[in-house]
From Swiss-Prot:
InterPro entries: AA-Vitamin_Transporters, EamA_dom
Family affiliation: Belongs to the EamA transporter family.
UniProt cross-references to SUPFAM superfamilies, sorted A to Z: Multidrug resistance efflux transporter EmrE
A GO-annotated cellular component: plasma membrane
Membrane-spanning segments: 4-24, 41-61, 71-91, 95-115, 120-140, 146-166, 174-194, 214-234, 239-259, 267-287
Protein name: Uncharacterized transporter BU281
Domain EamA: 15-139, 161-287
Taxon lineage: Bacteria, Pseudomonadati, Pseudomonadota, Gammaproteobacteria, Enterobacterales
Signal peptide: none
Amino-acid biosynthesis as UniProt keyword: no
Length: 307
């Protein structure tokens, strides 16, 4: 029964994250990105607050860390998610999903450079392979479109590393709060901030919003924003971080298939070939530290016996 539940959760998370990128593109067809992101959070936050009420989960972070809750609202929710929708206007969903499939690599890179975390040789090799391969894929994509999407790619990369930085900060502070606490108030604050800002910089006209863009907002807010995140965190409780993180290798395939089906945009053949080393690099960074320590200890003991 537990294995069936894990398979269901893994499939749901992969499907949810894979369809998210198409939903973002559909949402921004008629709705400006900042306003779309703000409405997405305003749709999600009431449900999260209700869940917090019925599960008796606190809305505020522990005393002494509440200032960090505001930082999360801005640099994990407001700016990165707005940049995701903005970047999705210029970049194909398949390429955008490939960028975000590198999240484990981005987190490891930030941990290495910012937190001075010691990495195993395997992790360093995986990080190097992944970053070089991702850069190559993005350069191929830029050249194929005459550098039209450079703004979108920069926006997505900034969003990626902003998420990675906040995640690393959470590790540094040993932040241990409920997933509902982490999302509820920051979503509400981000929704208010982005919606208000949008009225001044984007001047959205509600009468021009299409029905499918509005439906995409509700999908992003309720299904993807709540159901997808809760499913992923529940999956992490059922399996190791390594197996849970392999979802980052699956959802770009779903995003690419859906984009080809809906928009008839196929990923370039040369980019497909570079995806394989990218997957290898990401897998190398995901190998559990305990497993690497066991291998290192075995090698150390073997070398002592030989010499």
């Amino acid at each position: 029964m537990n294995k069936i539940l894990v398979i269901i959760l893994f499939s749901l998370v992969s499907l949810t994250w894979g369809t998210t990128w198409i939903a973002m593109k559909i949402a921004t067809e008629t709705i400006p990105p900042f306003f779309a992101t703000g409405m997405r959070f305003l749709v999600a936050s009431p449900i999260l607050i209700i869940l917090a009420y019925f599960t008796k989960t606190p809305l505020l972070f522990p005393y002494g860390q509440r200032w960090f809750q505001l930082i999360i609202s801005i640099f994990y929710f407001s700016i990165p998610f707005a940049l995701m929708l903005y970047g999705g206007m210029y970049v194909s969903s398949s390429v955008a999903s490939i960028i975000f499939s590198s999240m484990p690599v981005a987190v490891l890179t930030v941990s290495f450079l910012y937190l001075k975390k010691k990495l195993f040789l395997t992790q360093k090799i995986g990080m190097f392979i992944s970053l070089i391969t991702l850069l190559t894929i993005l350069l191929i994509e830029l050249e194929s479109q005459c550098f039209f999407q450079w703004k979108g790619i920069l926006a997505l990369l900034f969003a990626l590393f902003s998420h990675a930085f906040i995640y690393s900060e959470c590790q540094k502070k040993c932040l241990n709060v409920s997933v509902i606490t982490f999302n509820a108030l920051p979503s509400l604050l981000s929704g208010i901030l982005l919606s208000t800002t949008s009225w001044f910089i984007e001047s959205p006209h509600i009468n021009t919003f299409s029905n499918r863009s509005i439906l995409a907002i509700f999908y992003l807010g309720d299904f993807s924003g709540i159901f997808g995140i809760l499913s992923y965190f529940y999956l992490q409780q059922k399996v190791s971080a390594f197996y849970a993180s392999t979802v980052f290798l699956i959802f770009p395939v779903i995003a690419g298939f859906l984009e080809n089906y809906i928009y008839k945009n196929a990923i370039l053949l040369c980019e497909i070939w570079f995806i394989f080393p990218l997957i290898i690099g990401i897998l190398l960074t995901l190998i559990p530290v305990n497993y690497l320590k066991k291998i290192r200890n075995k090698i150390t003991r073997l070398s002592c016996l030989l010499f």
